Amino acid sequence: MIQLAALVTDVGTSGPFVRVTLAAPTIAPGLAAGRFVLADLGDYLRALLFPARIEAQEFDVLVSPHHPAAALRPGIAVDLIGPLGQGFEIPAATDRLLLVASTAHLPVLLPLTHQKPGSAASLREKPGFSIALLLSAPTAADLYPIRLFPPAVEVTIVTTDGSAGHRGSPLDLFPDLVRWADCACIADDPATYPALAEIVREVRAGSGRRFVQALVVPPMACGVGACQGCAVSVVRGTKLACTDGPVFDLLELR
């Protein structure tokens, strides 16, 4: 864990999000999808930020226009602590990776759609490796633009009102996709997780540990487990999102 003043080098937009680029050469190499930093943005508690794009010297975060980080401007120094937490783990034997996200939670999974030394790159270079994304939103207007994904990512759209893609719920399409996958990573409203877990038990009984991994993000004030404020209920008791997670085996969640 490192504390440093990261320089904002660029601010722009990416679909419905504000994109903020932070130069953090000692933190960026340790980041991965699902790991995070805590940023001092002027409030009493630090703000939780997940990387959406990771390079050797810098990383991007994508936040809603109402997030405190959306007010940052190039040239501002932001005090960061990180990298923190345990991220998504993609087994080296994976040939078929499934990503499941609502647009609101999508930025956490975006590093898995791009090459990154030491993680996704080794998989993306495998012959026959493929990525499928099940992306949901209330309406077409709320979706992250498909054109912003790498061409190799096969995107399936679900909207509640049917204005784009499948009309209904991601639960409608999840069974067939999880049958196909070697590994699945989910970032969505945790209220959907019990139903997703039940589908996994039905169609992929006997799958190995962490076959399906899910993001759980309660308030994380300290990032190091000291405050005990981010407890997550699991099958064998509780774990802390900031140190044991925020990525957990979907089937271990209660």
Roles of regions detected by a PLM:
Residues T26, D43, T139, P190-A191, ...:
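Glycine-rich beta-alpha junction loops
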Residues A39, D79-I81, V232:
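A generic structural signal for residues embedded in beta-strands
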Residues Y44-R53, G85-R96, C242:
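Short, Lys/Arg- and Gly-enriched loop/turn segments at beta-strand edges
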Residues A70-A214, P219:
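FNR/FR-type flavoprotein reductase catalytic core
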Residues V216-P246:
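Local cysteine-cluster metal-coordination motifs and their immediate loop/turn environment
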Residues D244-F248, E252-R254:
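Phosphate-binding loop/pocket of nucleotide- and phosphate-handling active sites
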